[in-house]
Regions:
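Sec-dependent N-terminal signal peptides
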Residues: 1-33
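Well-ordered beta-sheet/strand-loop patches within structured domains
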Residues: 2, 32, 36, 51, ...
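Intrinsic disorder/low-complexity segments, especially N-terminal tails and targeting/processing regions
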Residues: 7, 26-28, 40-41, 53-55, ...
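Generic hydrophobic, helix-prone segments enriched in Leu/Val/Ile
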Residues: 25-28, 115-118, 130, 135, ...
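Cationic-aromatic interfacial patches
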Residues: 34, 39-44, 51, 57-180
Length: 490
């Protein structure tokens, strides 16, 4: 059973990144941002050979068995509905090995950690959150045990924030992603390996995102004067959002940036396909999540969500689904030219029932502010995307076969040879190909809560509960009356 880290736990440094780019028209006056170099990676700690234990005549009390607590796959997101509370009891009660003795630090490594903390502002974090002065005092005391305890505590805090992000779940509004490659044992191995190699800096740098977007934001932060605190905070927040994401997005993946209203297919770090997208209205915001796309459905039925079934009930073109007692359970819309999903939708199961699909109102892609859906992502030219993916890896679905299926008017599912991940994210700052930063409108007002948590020492972990936000109709009406200025550029 896996336990994700808190301030005093340990975690892994498994890292790999790919490219997401902002896609908007920009002004010639935008400032250039130089690309950053490759971030060094931490090497894996070598396992030690087990030493046989010899029994002694003296009887010793039995070592108590520690059992893992019943926790979800992401303790940073306790409200994540993907968590299955009925996991097998045997897995929940797996025995945990006895902990290793505390890691012992030398003064040189501890001072290296102090120096690292003092420059961590370059990655958008606050050095004071890690109390470097307190560690310096412990070093000067000459007490190795006290110094080691203080250094380990700060190493855990820093490594946690670099790998997972400083902002915790209560301030991550509508956040449903998890990173499965984190546990305390791997963090402990990272620490002990760094001490053995006398290279704290490399171990911590290896936790940083290596994605070009992160490098561009870091360069923008360095180029922004201290007096422009609002801009610096916005950049810092979006750097932290990159730390929220898994390091390995996949060799090939789709990423949707909601504030930017665009979807991108990335393969081997290169943008292979990118188009405009329509996201959820203020009253039905699109959440941040990840899912695995296994294929597409051609000529799909639209299963009307319960939350909006009143819009379809009894109307022409909608079909009721009745239960055994004859009562109407839900409403469906059959395939056809008026179907809200258009000709195709992606099969990407997830707890929020969010997916990419076509639309029967393609002219809406020309709108400046494209917050128009019930939460799903309407994607421009999505048939082209599906055709590419269905033909990849020797797929049998040729363009002619796809067209024949569409012409049949029948509902058909076509599967990809290799499923691929889809990430729906929320970056209010992003970089263009040349490194210039684009400011997107904070569509759902998610920035303030996350910004406040970024400035808290505990990243908002002490907040009462997640503040997942659904705007009221009044707020939606008020926002709709504002000018459509969702994009500003630098």
């Amino acid at each position: 059973m896996k336990t994700l880290i808190g301030p005093k736990e340990r975690l892994s440094s498994s890292l790999l990144w790919f490219t997401l780019l902002g896609s908007v028209a920009v002004s010639p006056a935008l400032a250039q941002i130089r690309p950053m170099g490759v971030v060094p990676q931490a090497t894996a700690n070598q396992p030690k050979t087990a030493v046989p234990v010899t029994k002694t005549p003296t009887a010793k009390p039995p070592v108590p068995v520690t059992r893992t607590p019943k926790v979800g796959p992401d303790t940073l997101a306790p409200a994540n509905p993907d968590f299955k509370a009925d996991q097998p009891e045997a897995a929940q009660q797996a025995q945990v090995p006895a902990p290793l003795p505390p890691a012992m630090w030398d003064a040189g490594s501890a001072m290296e950690l102090v120096a690292y903390i003092k420059q961590i502002g370059g990655d958008g974090l606050n050095p004071e959150d890690y109390d470097p002065e307190g560690l310096e005092t412990a070093i000067q005391s000459g007490n190795v045990a006290a110094m080691s305890a203080a250094a380990t505590e700060r190493f855990d805090q820093v490594s946690s924030d670099l790998a997972l992000g400083h902002v915790k779940k209560p301030a991550r509004i509508d956040w449903y992603l998890t990173d499965k490659d984190l546990d305390s044992a791997k963090q402990d191995a990272l620490l002990r390996g760094a001490l053995a190699r006398h290279d704290i800096t490399a171990a911590l740098n290896g936790l940083l995102p290596t994605h070009p977007q992160y490098a561009a934001l870091k360069a923008a932060l360095a180029a922004t004067p201290p007096g422009d605190q609002a801009r610096r905070d916005r950049i810092r927040l979006n750097m932290d959002r990159w730390r929220w994401l898994p390091r390995d997005l996949g060799e090939k993946y789709i990423i949707v940036n909601v504030p930017g209203f665009h979807a991108t297919l990335v393969e081997n770090g290169v943008n292979r396909w990118k188009q405009r997208a329509i996201a959820g209205k203020l009253s039905t915001p699109t959440p941040q999540l990840s899912a695995t796309a296994t294929g597409v459905i051609l000529n799909p039925w639209w299963e009307v969500p319960k939350s909006i079934e009143h819009e379809a009930a009894g109307k022409k073109g909608f079909v009721p689904v009745k239960g055994a007692d004859g009562s109407i359970q839900r409403w469906r819309q059959p395939p056809g030219p008026t179907n809200a999903l258009g000709q195709i939708k992606f099969v990407m199961p997830n707890s929020k029932a969010i997916y990419l699909h076509d639309t029967n109102a393609r002219s809406r892609f020309n709108s400046d502010t494209r917050a128009l859906s019930h939460g799903c992502v309407r994607t421009e030219h999505i048939m082209d995307l599906a055709t590419q993916l269905l033909g990849d890896d020797g797929g049998e679905w040729t363009p002619d076969k796809i067209q024949a299926a569409l012409d049949s008017k029948k509902t058909v599912q076509a599967n990809f040879v290799k499923p691929l991940p889809v990430y729906i994210v929320y970056f209010s700052d992003a970089a263009l190909l040349d490194g210039r930063i684009v400011d997107y409108k904070d569509l759902y007002g998610r920035d303030p809560a996350a910004m406040a948590a970024l400035k808290m020492k505990d990243g908002g972990a002490s907040l009462a509960k997640p503040v997942d936000q659904v705007a009221t109709p009044a707020k939606a009406k008020k926002a709709a009356a504002k000018p459509a200025d969702q994009v500003a550029t630098r």
